[in-house]
Amino acid sequence: MSSKVTRKIYFCGSIRGGREDAALYKRIIDQLQSYGEVLTEHVGDLEAQEEELGETCDDYYIHERDINWLFSSDAVVAEVTQPSLGVGYELGRALEHKKNVLCLYRPQPGKRLSAMIKGAENGKNFFVKEYKEEDVPDLLMNFFTSL
C-alpha cells in the first residue's frame, strides 16, 4: 500500500498591511487546496478572529510559526497587489531557501509592483504574473504542473 504525500503550500497575502483583498485571498486559497494543503489558509478567512490572524499573539511566536510553515512548504503562492512588508519578507526568505514561488499581481492605475519583487523573477523557481481573477485557475495549473 502506498501513501500519497500531500504538497504543502504557503500562501502569502497582506494581514497587517490591509485586509481589503481578504475575500480574493479566500477564493485563491480555495483553488490552491486542489493542489495540496494550504498551511496559511487563515490569511483568507474573512471571519478569522484576531488570534487566528496572529493579532493577539506575540510577534516572536507569529514569526517562528510562519517561518516554520514557510520552510516546510513545497511551494509558495503570494498575492502581492496590496503592499505588505511581511509578504516581502516572506518572499525574500522563500527565495533564499530556493522555494518555488508564484507571485500574483493585479495591475492598477498609478501603482507599480516593487522592483524587489518584479526584479527577483528568474524563470526557474520565482515567477511574477500580472493577472485578472479569471486567470487564476490557469496560472495555478501552469505553475503546479511545472514543479
Curated annotation (Swiss-Prot):
Q: GO biological process: what's one of them?
A: nucleotide metabolic process
Q: Which InterPro entries match?
A: 2'-dNMP_N-hydrolase, DNPH1, Nucleoside_deoxyribTrfase
One CC-aspect GO term: nucleus
Enzyme Commission (EC) number: 3.2.2.-
Gene3D superfamilies reported in the protein's UniProt record = 3.40.50.450
Superkingdom field: Eukaryota
Where does it reside? Answer: Cytoplasm; Nucleus
Has the keyword Nucleus been applied to this entry?
yes
Q: What is its main location?
A: cytoplasm
Provide the catalytic activity annotation: a pyrimidine 2'-deoxyribonucleoside 5'-phosphate + H2O = a pyrimidine nucleobase + 2-deoxy-D-ribose 5-phosphate; a purine 2'-deoxyribonucleoside 5'-phosphate + H2O = a purine nucleobase + 2-deoxy-D-ribose 5-phosphate
Q: Name one Pfam family in it.
A: Nuc_deoxyrib_tr
Q: Name one GO molecular function term.
A: 5-hydroxymethyl-dUMP N-hydrolase activity
Its job: Catalyzes the cleavage of the N-glycosidic bond of deoxyribonucleoside 5'-monophosphates to yield deoxyribose 5-phosphate and a purine or pyrimidine base.
The family classification in the record reads: Belongs to the 2'-deoxynucleoside 5'-phosphate N-hydrolase 1 family.
| UniProt name for this protein | Putative 2'-deoxynucleoside 5'-phosphate N-hydrolase 1
